[in-house]
Amino acid sequence: LPIVVPLLAPDRLGDYMRTIGIVPEKAERSELGVLPQHFADRFGWEELAAITARAWKSLTPEERERAIIVTSNYGEAGALVYHGRRLGLPPATSQHNNFYLWGPGKPEATIVVAVGISPDDLREVFEDVTPVASLTDRFAMPYEREHPVTIGRGPKIPLAEAWVQGKKFI
């Protein structure tokens, strides 16, 4: 039952599963985490929304008019859309899977609050890249454990062009 319904604390669930010989099933193409993916994917979203809200609110009102929130994947975007409402965030966008089809939100944007995108990748598109914070959650899937939140200003190319270049369908 604890494997289906989250009855145990995360540490105890991992210990319980190892004790009875259950290894999380591999549902993605990357390494396994401590917990099954259906539990691991639930960790850190509220904290990520709070960090993103701090970054968003650090922008001046004038900057917010020219800004969007872009995430590295649809899970982060969905989490920010859901948890960000109560924090006053605009809907997040992503170039990942079907979120890509909804577009960048404001094609004229010149500032991006980037979530889960490495500052090095942002430097390819923006002149000024300012790291704000990073969320680390040991119970998340290994590829989701580090979520940098960064502000990019001064696009080197039009956002519409960067949007098309960054499309990720998997």
Where are each of the predicted segments found?
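Short active-site oxyanion
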Residues: R64-I69, T110-V112
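Extended hydrophobic/aromatic segments used for targeting, binding, or gating
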Residues: V81-F126
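Membrane-proximal, lumen/periplasm-facing interface regions of secretory-pathway glyco-
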Residues: L1-E65, G75, Y82-G88, Q95-N97, ...
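An alpha-helix initiation/capping motif
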Residues: V70-Y74
